[in-house]
């Protein structure tokens, strides 16, 4: 089927962003591959006549596909051959999620970034994917890869999706960046039959030792910035996540924890013994009852 790209301009008073969002959401409910981008502008309804680098690139890659800028991030139809410690950590959970998702399933990737996971799942398993990311540059990269994307706040995107509209909702190491992440996870369980949540375990023994010995938060490949330069972070542990799940079930939210995968501090070797202390990365499957 044909793909649709809707581009809204923030100051357009005739075809407002909210009206354009409604068009895209309606198309998505009908099972169409529809994407939404929003361009900041001050020229009202004439904004599209002025153009911008982002607008021009979005239109170009929608029709032509990958451009030189995006080729630098191209994964060549598979997970890239990673060599650095940073790259290994960046994609560690992708491989687990790939094992869990079945062919032809509907997948919603929240905080999808450049769309590499959805691109891979589309090419290898023919999934019907939709990404959500607030970053316009990353959303345009999704367009270049042929991945349907909704450039929007995650809460807004979830609120406008019907119940059980996806087989999987993916949180790939971005839950800690959300305000009130517990409520967002529960909303994802309304939209999806299964939810995959991956996160950094901040009770990992090296983190504890670093704080005990140096009295400072850790700085590494995953968190390279000092506290004053970093974004919103809700740091939590494996034990705290399982407590959230248990409390939510007591409160009447019908879901169960399915599969769990824990990686040691290198994010490669598996960890089964005392994961709250020894695991650096956790990936959970939540299943709606």
Residues of each region from the PLM?
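Catalytic active-site module of serine/aspartate enzymes centered on a nucleophile-bearing elbow/loop
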Residues: 35-74
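Short beta-strand/loop motif that positions the catalytic acidic residue
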Residues: 6-8
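Conserved alpha/beta-hydrolase "acid-adjacent" motif
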Residues: 14-19
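A short SAM/SAH-binding and catalytic strip from SAM-dependent methyltransferases
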Residues: 168-179
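Class I SAM-dependent methyltransferase SAM/SAH-binding core
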Residues: 116, 120-157
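Conserved alpha-helix/loop element of class I SAM-dependent methyltransferases that forms part
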Residues: 88-104
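Class I SAM-dependent methyltransferase "Motif I" SAM/SAH-binding loop
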Residues: 111-113
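S-adenosyl-L-methionine-dependent methyltransferase catalytic module, highlighting the catalytic core
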Residues: 182-190, 194-288
């Amino acid at each position: 089927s044909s793909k649709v790209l809707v581009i809204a301009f923030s100051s357009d008073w005739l075809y407002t962003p909210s009206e354009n969002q409604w068009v895209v959401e309606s198309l998505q409910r009908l099972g169409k591959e529809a994407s939404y981008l929003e361009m900041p502008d001050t020229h009202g309804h004439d904004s599209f006549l002025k153009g911008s680098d982002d607008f021009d690139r979005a239109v170009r890659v929608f029709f032509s596909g990958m451009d030189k800028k995006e080729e630098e991030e191209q994964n060549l139809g598979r997970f890239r051959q990673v060599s650095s410690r940073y790259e290994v950590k960046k994609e560690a959970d992708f491989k687990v999620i790939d094992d869990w998702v079945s062919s032809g399933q509907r997948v919603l990737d929240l905080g999808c970034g450049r769309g590499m996971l959805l691109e891979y799942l589309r090419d290898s398993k023919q999934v019907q994917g939709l990404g959500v990311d607030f970053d316009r540059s990353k959303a345009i990269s999704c367009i270049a890869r042929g991945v349907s994307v909704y450039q929007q706040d995650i809460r807004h995107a979830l609120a406008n999706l019907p119940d059980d509209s996806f087989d999987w909702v993916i949180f790939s190491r971005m839950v800690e960046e959300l305000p009130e992440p517990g409520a967002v996870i529960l909303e994802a369980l309304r939209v999806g039959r299964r939810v995959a949540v991956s996160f950094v375990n901040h009770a990992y023994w090296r983190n504890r030792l670093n704080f005990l010995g140096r009295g400072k938060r850790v700085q590494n490949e995953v968190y390279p910035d000092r506290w004053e330069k970093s974004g919103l972070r809700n740091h939590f542990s494996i034990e705290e996540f399982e407590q959230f799940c248990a409390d939510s079930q007591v409160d009447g939210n019908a879901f169960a924890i399915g599969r769990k995968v824990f990686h040691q501090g290198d994010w490669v070797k598996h960890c089964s013994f005392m994961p709250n202390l020894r695991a650096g990365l956790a990936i959970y499957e939540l299943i709606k009852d």
